[in-house]
Amino acid sequence: MMKERMRFKSNLFKIVNGVLIDLPSPRNFTFWWNFGSLLGLVLSIQLVTGIFLAMHYSCDSLLSFESVCHILRDVNEGWIIRLVHANGASFFFICLYCHIGRGMYFGSYMQTKTWIMGVLLFILVMAAAFLGYVLPWGQMSFWGATVITNLFSAIPYIGGDLVYWMWGGFSVGNSTLTRFFSLHFLVPFLVSLGAMLHIFFLHTTGSNNPLGVVADSDKIPFHIYYSAKDLLGFFFMFFFIIFISFLYPNLLGEPDNFIPANPLLTPHHIVPEWYFLFAYAILRSIPNKLGGVLGLLCALLVLFSLPLTHSNFFKSNALYIISRYFFWLFIVSFLMLTIGGGQPVCEPYVMCSQVWSCLYFTYFILCGPLRIFQDYYL
C-alpha cells in the first residue's frame, strides 16, 4: 500500500496544502499577482517588529518621544527594528495600492465577497497606519492627530461629543495617546484575521487571471511554479526594505516629526504620511468641512461600487481599449493627488487638486457605461 504523504495526514496540513501547494492556479498569472503574497510577507514583518517595539515603547505623552529615541540609541538593534517597521509600512502600502490597482484593471472585483473583504481590510489598514503615525509624538504626529480627529466634529449632532470621547478630554493629550497605542497594537491582529478570511473567500471562488475568463480546465498547482515566483518577489522586497532602511532611513518620513510635540507651536504645513496624501488632497480640495469629510470617505468607499457597475462581456480592462486608457488616466489622477496633498494649501495646488479629484471620481462613474459602449461595437 502506498504510504500517505505528510501533507494529507492531518486537517491542519490539508489546509496548508490547499493554500500553498496543490492550489489550482491559472497558468497565465503575471507578476501583478505577486503583490498578494508580498502583502502577507510585509504584514508578518510589521507584526514581528511592532511587538518588539512595543516592549520598549512608553505610551505617555511626556515619555513617548524619548522612548523612541531610547529604542534608536540604547536598545540592541533597536534602530534597525524601528526603521524596518517605519519603512515597512510604506512598502506595505506600495504593495497594497498595486494589489488594488491590479484588481480594478483585471476585474477581480467581480469576486464580490473577496473584493468587499479586501476593501474593508484596506480601510482597517489605513486606520492602523494613522494610529501608528501618532505614536512617536512628534510635531507632525500631534498636529496630524489633532486635525484628523477634528474631522469627526463635522458629523451632525454627535460630532463634538464623539471627538471629546476619542481625545479622552478637551484636547489631544495623554489619554488620546494611550487609546491610540492600544488600538494600534490590536488592529494588526484584526487585519491578520481579515486577511485569512480574504484568502478563504478567494480560494472558494478561485483566482482571477489576466484575461478575466474562466479557466478551470487549464490550471497548474501553485507549488512549485508560483511559490518559486513568490520567493523571488520576497527576495526583492527584503532587498528594497533593507536598502531604504540602511541607506535612506528617513527618505519617506517627515522632518517635523523629529521635533517633540509642542501644542503651542503649529507646523507651517501639516502633512500626513505619503500614502494618505491622495485622500488628504481630496479633503482639502472641497471648501467645506462636512463636504471635505464626505469626499475623503467617498474616495475609499467608492471601491465598494465597482461590482455594481460591471455588466459586460469581459472582466478585464485589457480587452477594452478605451477603458484601458481611462484606467491609466485614473492612475495619473491618483499620483497627482498624492503630489498635491503634500503641497501647501494655496493656488495653484488647490485648483489642481479639485481637477484631479473630479477625474478620480469620474472613473468610477463612467467605467461601467464605457464598457457597455464598447460591448455594443464588438
From Swiss-Prot:
- Annotated signal peptide: none
Q: Which UniProt keywords apply?
A: Electron transport, Heme, Iron, Membrane, Metal-binding, Mitochondrion, Mitochondrion inner membrane, Respiratory chain, Transmembrane, Transmembrane helix, Transport, Ubiquinone
Q: Which residues bind heme b b562?
A: H85, H184
Q: Tell me how this protein sits in the membrane.
A: Multi-pass membrane protein
Residues involved in heme b b566 binding: H99, H198
The positions annotated for binding a ubiquinone are H203
Q: What is this protein called?
A: Cytochrome b
Origin organism is: Paraspadella gotoi
